[in-house]
């Protein structure tokens, strides 16, 4: 089963076991995911379910999107996401909730990492800085040489240099679900997940067996 849910990162806290052990957890709010389209091999070439979550003002929905949501008879959400399916059956208008998961289950969480803007090599690639003294004047944080001379006469592709850091899709694998709160639509996942508070995250059953 590869189907998951789309949630919103609420932040981190901690909970205590009966033995008094502190467990750091990330709270993910999973509003009911509404199915907007069910794709089949006959019509689309593969089996998948398309969902939306949250709400969006009507003035922020294009006519094409409004028609797509109206056809499925669901309220417009803040986006659409797709999950490949095995033998599961869904129909437009169905809802997928946190009941899909249970405590102790391992999941993969995908989100967009925090954007850091333009960053140097020390922040971006963990380069070590150069000497603060001993004749070094203005090169304390420079990366140093980026290649050779006439041969090969170019900088190799993939060279670690300064550039944009963050704001990219990141997946953290094999996190444990500590608690499922179906009444408040919350998932408590052990550890940290990518992205800023309030960002969208995708929670799927873990692809790899732990250990």
UniProtKB/Swiss-Prot annotation:
Question: What PROSITE patterns does the annotation carry?
Answer: RIBOSOMAL_L3
Known InterPro entries for this protein? Ribosomal_uL3, Ribosomal_uL3_bac/org-type, Ribosomal_uL3_CS, Transl_B-barrel_sf
Q: Which GO MF terms does the UniProt record name?
A: rRNA binding; structural constituent of ribosome
What are its GO biological-process terms?
Answer: translation
Q: How is it modified after translation?
A: Methylated by PrmB.
Which residues are reported to carry the modification N5-methylglutamine? 150
A cellular component term, taken from the record's GO annotations: cytosolic large ribosomal subunit
* Record's keyword terms, sorted: Methylation, Ribonucleoprotein, Ribosomal protein, RNA-binding, rRNA-binding
Cited Pfam families: Ribosomal_L3
Under the heading HAMAP family, the entry gives:
Ribosomal_uL3_B (MF_01325_B)
> What does it do?
One of the primary rRNA binding proteins, it binds directly near the 3'-end of the 23S rRNA, where it nucleates assembly of the 50S subunit.
Q: Which family does it belong to?
A: Belongs to the universal ribosomal protein uL3 family.
Q: How does it assemble?
A: Part of the 50S ribosomal subunit. Forms a cluster with proteins L14 and L19.
What is the name attached to this protein's record?
Answer: Large ribosomal subunit protein uL3
Lineage of producing organism: Bacteria, Pseudomonadati, Pseudomonadota, Gammaproteobacteria, Pseudomonadales
